[in-house]
């Protein structure tokens, strides 16, 4: 599997995936196996919704374990760019304001494996991140979004 996809992520993001993998393998997998055993005791498996639900959950857990193992195995840790501290890049937080008088927003740009917009982490493949990467504090940038274009000014990069 020489051409497996690489997954850029922060060290913290990789650790979070490793914790989830450990939980799925040591706790969740056992819980699901136990639920399957209990559901088998309910009789006819052809009309046993508890058994079907437990088997579906088992398939989901096993699929997630495989996905996590692949992402961890192919993780590329994002190193901090100390030579260009004011340039937007993977692993950095960027604060910008929508022009002419919009509100301030801050996002951390991460790899797709650890993106979580609700935690302020956006994928480097997102339209906003693609538009901002490579720009620096003070730059005005046109960002393409599903809702149309917006003009933003970068006010901070950390």
Swiss-Prot record:
GO molecular function: DNA binding; RNA polymerase binding
Keywords of the record: Coiled coil, DNA-binding, Transcription, Transcription regulation
One record GO biological process: DNA-templated transcription elongation
Matching InterPro entries: GreA/GreB_C_sf, TF_GreA/GreB_CS, Tscrpt_elong_fac_GreA, Tscrpt_elong_fac_GreA/B, Tscrpt_elong_fac_GreA/B_C, Tscrpt_elong_fac_GreA/B_fam, Tscrpt_elong_fac_GreA/B_N, Tscrpt_elong_fac_GreA/B_N_sf
Residue ranges the record marks as coiled coil: 10-75
The keyword Coiled coil is assigned to this record: yes
Lineage top rank: taxon: Bacteria
Similarity field: Belongs to the GreA/GreB family.
Function noted in UniProt: Necessary for efficient RNA polymerase transcription elongation past template-encoded arresting sites. The arresting sites in DNA have the property of trapping a certain fraction of elongating RNA polymerases that pass through, resulting in locked ternary complexes. Cleavage of the nascent transcript by cleavage factors such as GreA or GreB allows the resumption of elongation from the new 3'terminus. GreA releases sequences of 2 to 3 nucleotides.
NCBIfam families: greA (TIGR01462), PRK00226.1-2 (NF001261), PRK00226.1-4 (NF001263)
This protein's name: Transcription elongation factor GreA
Organism for this UniProt entry: Geobacillus thermodenitrificans (strain NG80-2)
Gene: greA
């Amino acid at each position: 599997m020489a051409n497996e996809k690489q997954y850029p992520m922060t060290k913290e993001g990789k650790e979070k995936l490793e914790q989830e993998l450990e939980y799925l393998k040591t706790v969740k997998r056992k819980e699901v196996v136990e639920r399957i055993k209990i559901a088998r005791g309910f009789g006819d498996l052809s009309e046993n919704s508890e058994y079907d639900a437990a088997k579906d959950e088992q398939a989901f857990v096993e699929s997630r374990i495989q996905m996590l193992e692949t992402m961890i195995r192919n993780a590329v840790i994002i190193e901090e760019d100390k030579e260009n501290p004011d340039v937007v890049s993977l692993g950095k937080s960027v604060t910008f304001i929508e022009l002419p008088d919009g509100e301030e927003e801050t996002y951390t740009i991460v790899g797709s494996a650890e993106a979580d917009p609700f935690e302020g982490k956006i994928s480097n493949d997102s339209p906003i991140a693609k538009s901002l990467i490579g720009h620096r504090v003070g730059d005005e940038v046109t960002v393409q979004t599903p809702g149309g274009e917006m003009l933003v000014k970068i006010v901070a990069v950390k």
